[in-house]
Structure formats: C-alpha cells, structure tokens
C-alpha cells in the first residue's frame, strides 16, 4: 500500500458526492450519568413489606386518652377569678383538670400493656401554665415543661412529654396526632353562641394573660373518651402513680 492510501487516525472522513467534510474523532463515554442523591431517593424503586389485614386499624377518631392528673387538694389560686367570670355566663369550670399526654386509637381487642415505664419518664416534671385562650369551643390555658431541675438531676428536662409519645409509638400504640399545643382545658363554651365565645376568650386573654400557675402531676391515667364519669370526673381504666423524687427540691422551684 502506498503513502496515498494512508488514513489519518485523528479524523474520520465522510465523502459525499460534492464535498469532503472532516469531523474530529471523539471517544464515546460508557460511564453512566450521575444523578443527584435526592433524585436517587426520589425515583429509586422501593420494596415494601406486604400489608396484612391485621396491620390495618379502622379508627376515625381517638378512643382513649393517656393523661396526667394532679393532687385534688392542690389549690389553683389564680383560677378563682376565672371561675367568677364563667359564673356570669352560666358556664361551669372544669372539675377534671388534666393534661393530655397522647390520644390513642384502640380498636376492638386492643389491650393496654403496663405503662409504668412512662411514669419514670414523666417523674419530677413541673408544668407551667400560662396564657389563656379559646381552642375551638373550649377555654384552655397553655402548658409547658418548666426547666427547674439541674441537668445532672433530670436529663430530659423539657422533653418528657415528647419522649412519652415516642415510647408509645415504639411499643405499637396507634397515637392520634392532633397538632394542638400542650394545654389544660378550663371550661366548655358550647352553651354560648359564637359572639359570646369570642368575647369571653378575648376578655380572659386581656385580663388574665399573665396568669401563671405551677403544678407537678402525681398520676398517669388511661381513660375511655366516651367512658363513664363520676361527679364530673372521668373514671380511669388504669392509673399509675408518679413518684416525684425531687418534689421537695426548692433551689429552683417557683411554685409549690
């Protein structure tokens, strides 16, 4: 083969009938296109465990309430003025004061296990009640965990109620998430019309916005939401005493 027949390895020659076009030889990549990690998670095929009939619980609304109650001899000093105002509207102050830890959907045949571990999580928890407002047709006061113990005495200060909910979920309970803030119901306003409810709510907000109470729960109860009541108080299905070991620790205790 003579020199005129040599091919230039750096190009590919296409020879149509009229012109000659020279194109650079570019290697073809065999690498796969990289995807963003978020796209990988979004579009990757996922394998799910088949759902069994026993895994499905038909529950339109919560059936049980896990709640914290207080010593019945506790004197709520700042609530006297609230009771007097409610009397003018023929509204009864709630005799069953409590704070809800979680609402649970329990179908037929669902049983509650021993909830004693929750009492250790919730022990020595001081609640601060402040800020009265209306929530739907209910007059409530906001509640939050008060940081009163040093970290070396109580490691979950301010986290007890969320940890209690996590414990229930981890142990198979179907917790109903309301999205409502932690609070304590003071009175039902169902007997009032919308204008009266709004007026009462604003009146309490203005006059009692600085009302603050402190209390420490003494018992954990499980009640049926539509269950029996005795003297206006829900009859508990189960109850577990809470042993507050540092209730006499007064270094940072603002209340009783």
Swiss-Prot record:
GO BP, sorted A to Z: symbiont-mediated suppression of host cytoplasmic pattern recognition receptor signaling pathway via inhibition of IKBKE activity; symbiont-mediated suppression of host type I interferon-mediated signaling pathway
UniProt main location, coarse: host cell
Protein name: Non-structural protein ORF4b
InterPro entries, sorted: ORF4b_HKU5-CoV
Localization (cell): Host nucleus; Host nucleus, Host nucleolus; Host cytoplasm
Gene name tied to this protein: ORF4b
Key words of the record: Host cytoplasm, Host nucleus, Host-virus interaction, Inhibition of host IKBKE by virus, Inhibition of host innate immune response by virus, Inhibition of host RLR pathway by virus, Viral immunoevasion
Biological function: Plays a role in the inhibition of host innate immunity by inhibiting the interaction between host IKBKE and MAVS. In turn, this inhibition prevents the production of host interferon beta. Additionally, may also interfere with host antiviral response within the nucleus.
GO CC field: host cell cytoplasm; host cell nucleolus; host cell nucleus
Species whose genome carries this gene: Bat coronavirus HKU5
